[in-house]
Every structure is written in structure tokens, then in C-alpha cells.
Amino acid sequence: MPSFRTLLSALLACTFLHTLAAADELTKLTFGVVPQQSASKLANKWSPILKRISEETGIQISFATAPSIPLFEKKLSEGDYDLAYMNPLHYTFYSQSPGYVAIAKQANKKIRGIIVAQKDAKITSLDDLDNTSMAFPAPLSFAATVLPRAELKGQDIQIKPHYVKSHDSVYRSIAMGLYPAGGGIERTFDLVEPETKSQLKILWKTKGYTPHAIAAHPRISASQRRQIQSALLNLNNSEEGRELLSALQFSGIDSASDADWNDVRALNYSVK
């Protein structure tokens, strides 16, 4: 029969290990959002969701973004964000290094890239874009840049890309007549201000792919990932939660695993 001293030693060891595990869990986390739109617009849409998740988990989660998509990519590569909402191509890169782990994604959604043009412009097909300049958010914007440019290249349509840092900047620059056309995605096109959207038309759409990932940096413990994932999924279960999601044009949130983005990996895209 174990002696009292042995039992006491075991109890102290368990307590010590539990204390170490608790110390490893962070109480303040940053949630980085890809800057497809202005920081103020993104903060208005995401901060109420993060507040709700913070209240449910007891973990303080604060909104963060970057001035441009390339700077956001740099922060992801350096692991600056504890949690992040990133495009599908970003996820395939940054799940490798620094090792972000997918926990959730938009429900009932496939992301599609679009090419938009001025509504009154005499552009009716992709062929009309040959030898023009086009606006795109950033080189690694998956659906808004990579997919449209691949299609144009496949049709031997020569264009000169100009990177204007965000989706909203693409739409506004086309509406202002700075470019005849540019790349975006359906969700951000639907969210752009009506006075801009009314001047644009969708010229072409890509096929659908797994949408953006909500992912956690590997320094976030598995138990905290489960807590945050559960809180995200719980948004589906209340009217208030569904209203918060609707501000993002989300019909709901699904759990996610790394393999969900194998359709994007199958494109074998690499940065040249």
C-alpha cells in the first residue's frame, strides 16, 4: 500500500504539472483579420463577435489587422497573430510555417473570385481585357488575384496587374475609372458601399473553393482551441449570434480541419 509520503508526492507533482499547463495558456489573444476592407469597417463587424467569444471563454480576444494584405502576410509568416482569419491560399502556406491550425470556416460557402468592370464600359468578355491594366488587391489574394490571373493567362489574355492593397480599393478605383476592370470576391463585392457597387458589373466568376480559414497559432493550447471553436460554433445557436454573423455575410460557422483546404493545395500554387 502506498505510504502517505508517496501519495503526497504524487499529489504535489500533479498540482505542479497542472500549474505549468495553466501557465502555458494565454489569457490575452490577438485575432488578425485579412484587410480586404478598411480597418474601421472590419473592426465594426468583427469586434462584437470577438467580444461574445471572449465572454464565453473567459479569454480576452482583441481585433487586429494590418494596413495592407502584404503586411498582413508578413505578420502571419512571423506568427504575430494568436488567431487569424486568412484566405485559403494563406492557410496552405502558413499552416506549414509557422504552423497555424484551422478551427473554423464559413458555413455553406465556397469562395469564388470575380472580375468586375465598369457597368457602362464597353467590356463584355474577358477578351476585351487584352493589353489592359487591371486592379488587384495583392499578389497572394487567392480568389481575387490568383484565380482570375490564372484564367486570363490560360486564355492568353495579356494584362498588367496593379496591386491596390484591398478589395474595396479595387472596386473604388474601377468605379472612378482608374482601371477598366479588376479582381475581387462575391462577399466583399456584396459589402461594398452602394454608390460604388451601382457603377460596377460582374464580368466573370471562378469555380468554388473552400473559403477563408479561422486558424490558431500553435502556441495556443489544444484546450483553448477547443474552447474558442466551441464559442464560434455557438454563434449558430442564438438569434444574437446569427445576427453578428450576418454582418459578415455569413450564414453560419462550421468546424474545420486542415484537410478541408486540400482542394486549394491541389492547385500546386507557389510564390515565384
Model-predicted segments: where are they?
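Short loop->beta-strand "edge-of-pocket" segments that line small-molecule binding or catalytic clefts
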Residues: 29-36, 42, 127-144
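Extracytoplasmic small-molecule ligand-binding "clamshell" domains
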Residues: 24-90
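Short helices/loops that flank or line small-molecule/ion binding pockets
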Residues: 70-84, 97-98, 127, 168-183, ...
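Glycine/small-residue-rich loop that forms an oxyanion/phosphate-binding "nest" at active or ligand-binding sites
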Residues: 92-117
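Pocket-lining segment of extracytoplasmic ligand-binding domains
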Residues: 121-122, 131-223
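Bacterial N-terminal signal peptides
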Residues: 9-18
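Bacterial N-terminal signal peptides that target proteins for export
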Residues: 1-8
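Periplasmic-binding protein-like
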Residues: 27-36, 42, 108-117, 195-236, ...
